[in-house]
C-alpha cells in the first residue's frame, strides 16, 4: 500500500482527476491530508508543519519507506520509480509552499529518500495528481498491463 501524505486545505482544482486515479488504484493508494499551519512567520510554519509530518509518520507509517517529493532532487523515469517502490509500503510526502525542514526529517528518518518530477515549481495538488498518475503507471507495470510506457 502507498500513502500520499500532504499538507493541504483543498484539492478542488483537480479533484475529479485525482478521484479517477484513486478509483483505478482502489486500495493501493490512500490519502492522508494534514491541515496547513497558518502564520505570517514562514520559519514557524515550516517548523510546525515538519513536526506534524514527523508525528504522523511516527504514529502511522514508521515501517513504510519514506519518499519526499522535492524539485531539486533525483529525477526518475516511471520504471525507476517502480523499482524504488516495488512491493513495498511507501509514504510519499508532498509539502506545502514554504517547505519542510528536510534536515530535521533526514535526521529523524535515516531511510528518507527524495525524488523529483522536475525542476519546475508546481502546486501541491498538481504534484499530487502527477504522483498518483505515476503510481497508476507503476501498477500497470506490476500487472503487465500496457499503459503508454
Tell what function each PLM region has.
Residues 88-104, 124-126:
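Ser/Thr/Gly-rich flexible loops in soluble cytosolic domains mediating phosphotransfer, phosphorylation
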Residues 104-149:
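Structured adenosyl-cofactor binding patch, chiefly the S-adenosyl-L-methionine
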Amino acid at each position: 500500500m502507498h500513502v500520499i501524505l500532504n499538507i493541504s486545505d483543498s484539492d478542488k482544482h483537480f479533484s475529479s482527476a485525482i478521484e479517477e486515479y484513486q478509483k483505478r488504484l482502489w486500495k493501493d493508494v490512500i490519502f492522508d491530508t494534514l491541515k496547513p499551519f497558518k502564520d505570517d512567520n514562514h520559519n514557524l510554519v515550516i517548523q510546525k508543519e515538519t513536526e506534524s509530518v514527523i508525528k504522523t509518520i511516527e504514529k502511522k507509517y514508521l515501517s513504510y519507506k519514506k519518499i519526499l517529493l522535492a524539485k531539486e532532487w533525483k529525477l526518475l523515469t516511471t520504471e525507476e520509480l517502480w523499482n524504488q517502490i516495488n512491493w513495498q509500503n511507501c509514504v510519499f510526502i508532498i509539502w506545502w509552499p514554504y517547505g519542510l525542514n528536510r534536515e530535521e526529517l533526514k535526521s529523524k528518518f535515516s531511510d528518507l529518500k527524495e525524488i523529483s518530477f522536475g525542476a519546475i515549481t508546481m502546486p501541491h495538488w498538481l504534484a499530487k495528481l502527477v504522483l498518483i498518475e505515476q503510481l497508476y503507471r507503476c501498477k500497470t507495470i506490476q500487472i503487465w498491463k500496457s499503459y503508454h510506457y
